[in-house]
Design a protein with these regions (language model features):
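Bacterial Sec-dependent N-terminal signal peptides
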Residues: 1-12
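Non-catalytic terminal accessory segments
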Residues: 27-35, 61-66, 77-80, 218, ...
Length: 404
């Protein structure tokens, strides 16, 4: 009888304990169910590299290109329900494909914008290189985009955003995400005098972001700034008009900051703000992960910079007719000369040695350390084309060379 009583008491206690735990478990499960996970993917400075190819050497690359980025983007979309894809500018300039062919015929389907449309971008921020061919050409090319192009700090002579938008609001699972785009206000330093450039006004980035946040008001749960500039000033040391750090200092409402322009990896957190930036030509992608609670407040956030080295390029992107044709046209332009008939031009000569010697110090090009044939060539071309008496140049691309 005593054993039976002990069993009955034990059973009652077990049932009572289980019952007491049920509400807590249900509460925890309910809270978890109300959390929302947002993944923001950020690219920038892709510099007209949809394929992942070095046209000067006629060789495939192994670690960059929009086709590799797209493979990774598709993987993330298959794993995460709420993905936002942003770009921070400098995309339509940078290779022979654009600079020598497609940007000279802006009414034609543009391979970079075609690729970005295929990849499903949600928004893009203007970069300074988008202005290289003047305002009219820029608008014709970017007008092909199926997504908004943002520049909250650049307005035309009529006081309108030069691209038609300074910010946009996206929605994922009920979470409203405001994306504010700002470009470096230093554009006139590089492109002043080109068509329409000096008709625009270029405002300090932090000031424009503050105004955009005021306009957005309570419409958004998250504030994302996509800035085509580095963290620290490039020219305006005193006021920080071209500093992304100044944006954060003046606008505590910002949750995510994407930086660009400097072609360098940035991966850090300041307080609760996640900050990311990537290297150029599609070498890396920034991944921001945020978790929001039932009140749509950020309770966890992180940033990761993902390298594209070894990633398989997307055949879907490469097989797109516009992109495939542009790739072949660029190779033909190099190998067949620039004549419309596609025939090779006259031989200008032959190289007897590399124009830039092998680096004596790893990652420090000889063209930046001493007199080299590659720098002599650049200066002679500048003298010939400008009619100047003196030419000074610095090596822009560390690997610039003419092989033996």
């Amino acid at each position: 009888m005593r054993n039976l009583l002990r069993k009955l008491v034990s059973g009652v206690l077990a049932v009572s304990l289980a019952a007491s735990l049920l509400p807590a478990a249900a509460f925890a499960a309910g809270n978890s169910a109300k959390e929302t996970h947002i993944t923001i993917l950020g690219t920038s400075d892709m510099h007209a590299n949809p394929w992942g190819f070095n046209y000067e050497d006629d060789k495939e690359t192994t670690n960059n290109g929009m086709a590799r980025l797209y493979t990774y983007i598709q993987q993330v979309r298959a794993e995460e329900p709420n993905v936002v894809l942003l770009d921070a500018g400098d995309d339509i300039q940078g290779t022979i494909m654009t600079d020598d062919i497609y940007n000279k015929k802006p009414e034609s389907p543009h391979p970079v914008i075609t690729a970005m449309n295929l990849m499903g971008y949600d928004a893009m921020t203007l970069g300074n290189h988008e202005f290289n061919w003047g305002i009219s050409t820029m608008k014709k090319i970017l007008g092909q985009a199926n997504f908004p192009v943002l520049a909250a700090n650049i307005k035309d002579a009529s006081g309108n955003y030069v691209t038609g938008a300074g910010w946009t609001i996206l929605e994922r699972s009920g979470v409203k995400i405001a994306v504010i785009g700002v470009d470096t206000p230093d554009v006139p330093i590089w492109d002043g005098g080109k068509e329409g450039i000096e008709d625009c006004t270029y405002e300090a980035a932090s000031t424009a972001v503050k105004q955009a946040i005021k306009e957005i008001g309570g419409q958004a749960d998250l504030i994302v700034v996509s800035a085509h500039m580095g963290l620290y000033p490039e020219f305006d040391e005193e006021h920080g008009a071209d500093s992304a750090q100044k944006i954060l200092d003046d606008n505590p409402e910002v949750d995510v900051l994407q930086v660009a322009h400097t072609h360098s990896t940035v991966n850090q957190k300041q307080g609760n703000v996640v900050i990311g930036g990537v290297r150029s030509s599609g070498r890396e992608i920034a991944r921001f992960d945020l978790t929001l609670n039932a009140n749509k407040k950020v309770i966890a956030s992180s940033v990761e910079i993902v390298d594209m080295n070894g990633v398989t390029p997307s055949e879907e992107l490469r097989s797109n007719p516009v992109i495939a044709e542009a790739h072949q046209a660029t190779r033909a332009f190099i190998s067949g000369g620039s004549g419309e008939d596609g025939e090779k031009g006259a031989s200008l000569g032959s190289t007897t040695a590399k124009f830039q010697p092998k680096n004596e110090i790893d990652r420090l090009p000889e063209g930046k350390l001493r007199d080299t044939a590659v720098m002599d060539l650049i200066n002679k071309v500048q003298l010939e084309n400008s009619g100047a008496d003196v030419s000074a140049a610095a090596l822009f691309k560390d690997t610039s060379d003419l092989p033996k």
